[in-house]
């Protein structure tokens, strides 16, 4: 049984931009509801749980697509491509193209400043994926994800999509109220024309990750990427 809760404007936008008609429209409305709105309207549900689900569905869809599309690429390369495709700036940009921010519900203090914030839009994109998965199953979510992000996959493989892992790590720590991480050169080896550097990234004296590179900047980016891996910051 269809659950109709969307206003005509959001319903028309959904059909045109998302290319999907929800059986349970409350799922899409939840995906478009920011925490600040839910705090002011106790009966509304914020999109955080759908974001949690959508993040996993999105990662799985892209991982499976990469596995099938590039059978000869090693795990490390597949991981880098996936990271470039599902990173916050990439998802936020697709959300802008789709107009997701214009149809979100915000609290009074967040409506102006939050509507175009990368983190907000990226989270909402993931929440929409979660809503599609619950309403239409994996096929609906997969169709949407590959339609919106499929072109980015090849661009990322060719190195045309760059991920600034240092900025991502710093922003993640800042959202937790923490100071910026510190980078230290650990190893410098090899002849001048084949120099290799190993850098460690530290937070409050604790090593978060290490990375090798042909120069210090490259090594710092790899160290930050390692620090962002789930096994490095799950605690």
Swiss-Prot record:
Its main location: cytoplasm. Residues 164-233 form the DRBM domain. Homodimer. GO terms for molecular function: double-stranded RNA binding; metal ion binding; ribonuclease III activity; rRNA binding. Its EC number is 3.1.26.3. InterPro entries: dsRBD_dom (IPR014720), RNase_III (IPR011907), RNase_III_dom (IPR000999), RNase_III_sf (IPR036389). PANTHER family: RIBONUCLEASE 3, RIBONUCLEASE III. One of its GO terms (biological process) is mRNA processing. This is Ribonuclease 3. Keywords: Cytoplasm, Endonuclease, Hydrolase, Magnesium, Metal-binding, mRNA processing, Nuclease, RNA-binding, rRNA processing, rRNA-binding, tRNA processing.
